[in-house]
């Protein structure tokens, strides 16, 4: 049977836009706290920005070389760009309808005001005038566009003001100028007087920008913003120094082609046409915005609000068992494997694992992969400390991790300075696996301790990405881990692995084998079940194998937060497949793979999604949960999420997503349930209601910075 028909597949890019619509739904959800709804709206903007600078940019490159091969859904690059444009324009309209018709009026009901210049009282007007004169004016640079001064370069994601001016006494002599809004100043300006009154910096500049043009009159002012191609193109095979090549490409990336132009609705048609021509874009790439450009400022607005704790998610305490503070982490791991579920379990034991290894005299070596780390990473600190304490420390820092290249280049150099052996990544592959190995001398001989995870070693994103990690001292897994690091650092090619599976190729082969096993079980008339949780499913071969399993009678449950190119409800093809997507307070990021295995279930965690890039072009890790209590907990986590009736959307046969019809069902928000369980564990551990672990105000779907906000995004772990 042919499982590759175009009608069986959804285009990857359009599926991603559907995901961002689900995030936008959270901004429109009246059951969410108001300030969290505002945050969600900012997140949709940052998500959309990266989508254009990477995915749309990639499609336009294909168009530029006349690449016409269709994707599995039958769409060429040109077809996709056209469909994206239609869907994205509609999304932008919905974003600003949500802002203007819902969120801003609701904020005003709570005495939180985003004001215009016309709204300011006398005191506030004097304040912004002084602010402009004393702070902003010296930093502003007017740029003319005429025969002797060509149109200036407009940087990616910078906010700019287009002006139409004429010389005093000569209204016919109209000229164009542009002024960049300096990003060294806060965009959200707190006004004096009543609390929670704000104005955007561009409104102040537009009001007083005329002082930059002496003997000229300003006829029109309007903001605009461009998004450029930021897709890094590193010629790895042709470079002898990967680090230098990445740094070179980072500089070149700043001048990528324009993918999208946003202009204020108030901008005249004449100005729009002039800008579009100067920037080299067509009408489909022009977005007319009914409100402030670049909604990522909303996270800054939320942070600036004083009081109103009731308009945020309530804080809670991650679980950090007392025994972790009382005993050596190595003794705990030696006793039994430890499964962690972040952020409900505190991430601190992972940091402690490296910290204790750095100080333990019996530790001989530490080996670790780093993909995205925070801007002030304690793990980096302790790895350097370990090297300075005479231990052999080897760290693979993936310098090609998208939009973290500069941060990772910085840390790679820092680790080298501290005495660590640093690997910058492998040619042609990104190392995306999350693996830490500690080699320790004990009375019984050399012992290996490991941490393997589904998410990054990032102490910041661990607060709002849901991930899982395993501590183990399993001997076979330890041998496998050593072989993986030997492969990453040298020329080793292990003939096989005992219990771990890696990509490229290995994870694909393993998943196919397990699905074939379930197909055989179903054909033998026995119950066969597959359960998977991942961020995205787009690989055509894996999807076709899932269709084959469904056709054979295997019951398949998929929890997929983001991209899903598989279609449900196709008669005889996907009748036995159900797909859920959970979008909530925290970003679902863990990967779980369950196979019923003829009554002896097998459960695995992984760093890999079922995407072609993860299976073919990444070094990924898939590892088993072997101890019964550990595997049972993992499946309880999956089942709780599957039973979610609050934040789940179910993929429909028409390719839309619908919320669960909760009539007659228990109301269950899986993330809220995990939070409740964590709080109960904290209280039970301390014997009172005063937790000792740090409380967290979690922010969903943002990237690894020490000050996460909606200018960052869910990067789909490229």
UniProtKB/Swiss-Prot annotation:
A GO BP annotation: polyphosphate biosynthetic process
Covalent S-S links between cysteines: none
Residues where Mg(2+) binds: 372, 402
Catalytic activity: [phosphate](n) + ATP = [phosphate](n+1) + ADP
InterPro entries: PP_kinase, PP_kinase_C_1, PP_kinase_middle, PP_kinase_middle_dom_sf, PPK_C_dom2, PPK_N_dom, PPK_N_dom_sf
A GO molecular-function descriptor: metal ion binding
Required cofactor(s): Mg(2+)
Region described as Disordered: 683-718
Reported function: Catalyzes the reversible transfer of the terminal phosphate of ATP to form a long-chain polyphosphate (polyP).
Similarity remark: Belongs to the polyphosphate kinase 1 (PPK1) family.
Protein name from the UniProt record: Polyphosphate kinase
Lineage: Bacteria, Bacillati, Bacillota, Bacilli, Lactobacillales
Gene giving rise to this polypeptide: ppk
């Amino acid at each position: 049977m042919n499982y590759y028909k175009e009608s069986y597949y959804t285009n990857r890019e359009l599926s991603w836009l559907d995901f961002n619509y689900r995030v936008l739904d959270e901004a429109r959800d009246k059951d969410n706290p108001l300030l969290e709804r505002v945050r969600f709206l900012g997140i949709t903007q940052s998500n959309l920005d990266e989508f254009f600078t990477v995915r749309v940019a990639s499609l336009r490159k294909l168009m530029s070389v006349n690449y016409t091969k269709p994707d599995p859904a039958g769409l060429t690059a040109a077809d996709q760009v056209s469909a994206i444009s239609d869907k994205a324009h509609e999304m932008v309209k919905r974003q600003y309808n949500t802002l203007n018709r819902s969120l801003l009026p609701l904020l005003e009901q709570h005495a939180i005001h985003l004001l215009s210049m016309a709204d300011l009282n006398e005191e506030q007007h004097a304040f912004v005038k002084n602010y402009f004169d004393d702070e902003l004016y010296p930093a502003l640079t007017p740029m003319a566009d005429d025969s002797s001064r060509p149109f200036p370069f407009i940087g990616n994601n910078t906010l700019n003001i287009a002006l139409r001016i004429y010389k005093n006494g000569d209204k016919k002599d109209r000229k164009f100028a542009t002024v960049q809004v300096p990003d060294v100043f806060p965009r959200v300006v707190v006004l004096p007087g009543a609390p929670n009154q704000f104005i955007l910096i561009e409104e102040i500049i537009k009001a007083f920008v005329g002082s930059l043009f002496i003997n000229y009159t300003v006829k029109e002012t309007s903001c605009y913003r461009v998004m450029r191609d930021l897709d890094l193109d590193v010629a790895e095979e042709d470079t002898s120094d990967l680090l230098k090549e990445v740094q070179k490409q980072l500089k070149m990336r700043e001048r990528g082609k324009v993918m999208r132009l946003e202009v204020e609705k108030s901008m005249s048609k004449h100005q729009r046409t002039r800008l579009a021509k100067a920037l080299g874009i067509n009408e489909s790439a022009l977005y007319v915005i009914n409100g402030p450009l670049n909604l990522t400022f909303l996270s800054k607005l939320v942070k600036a609000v004083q009081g109103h704790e009731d308009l945020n998610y309530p804080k809670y305490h991650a679980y950090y068992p007392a025994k972790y503070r009382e005993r050596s982490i190595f003794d705990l791991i030696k006793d039994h494997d430890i499964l962690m579920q972040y952020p409900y379990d505190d991430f601190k034991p992972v940091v402690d694992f490296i910290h204790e290894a750095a100080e333990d005299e019996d530790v001989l070596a530490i080996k670790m992969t780093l993909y995205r780390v925070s801007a002030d990473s304690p793990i980096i600190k302790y790895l350097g400390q370990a090297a300075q304490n005479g231990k052999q420390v080897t760290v693979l820092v993936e310098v090609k991790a998208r939009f973290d290249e500069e941060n990772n280049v910085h840390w790679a150099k820092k680790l080298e300075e501290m005495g660590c052996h640093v690997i910058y990544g492998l040619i042609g592959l990104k190392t995306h696996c999350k693996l830490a190995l500690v080699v320790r001398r004990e009375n019984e001989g050399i012992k290996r301790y490991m941490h393997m995870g589904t998410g990054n070693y990032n102490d910041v994103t661990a607060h709002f990405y849901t991930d899982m990690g395993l501590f183990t001292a399993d001997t076979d897994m330890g041998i496998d881990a050593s072989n993986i690091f030997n492969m990453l650092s040298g020329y080793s090619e292990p003939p096989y692995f005992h219990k771990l599976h890696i990509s490229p190729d290995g994870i694909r082969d393993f998943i196919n084998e397990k699905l074939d096993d379930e197909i055989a079980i179903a054909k033998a008339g026995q119950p066969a079940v597959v359960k998977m949780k991942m961020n995205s499913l787009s690989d055509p071969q894996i999807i076709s194998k899932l269709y084959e399993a469904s056709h054979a009678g295997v019951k398949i449950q998929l929890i997929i937060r983001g991209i899903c190119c598989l279609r449900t409800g196709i008669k005889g093809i996907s009748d036995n497949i159900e797909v859920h997507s959970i979008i909530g307070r925290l970003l679902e990021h863990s990967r779980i793979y369950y196979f019923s295995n003829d009554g002896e279930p097998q459960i695995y965690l992984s760093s890999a999604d079922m995407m072609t890039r993860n299976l073919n072009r990444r070094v990924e890790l898939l590892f088993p949960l072997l101890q019964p209590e550990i595997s049972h907990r993992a499946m309880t986590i999956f089942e709780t999420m599957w039973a979610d009736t609050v934040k789940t959307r179910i993929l429909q046969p028409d390719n839309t997503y619908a919320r669960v019809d909760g009539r007659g069902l228990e109301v269950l928000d899986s993330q809220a349930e995990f939070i409740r369980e964590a709080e109960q564990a904290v209280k039970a551990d301390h014997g009172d209601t005063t937790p000792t672990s740090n409380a967290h105000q979690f922010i969903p779907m943002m990237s690894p910075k020490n000050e996460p906000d909606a200018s960052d995004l869910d990067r789909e772990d490229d």
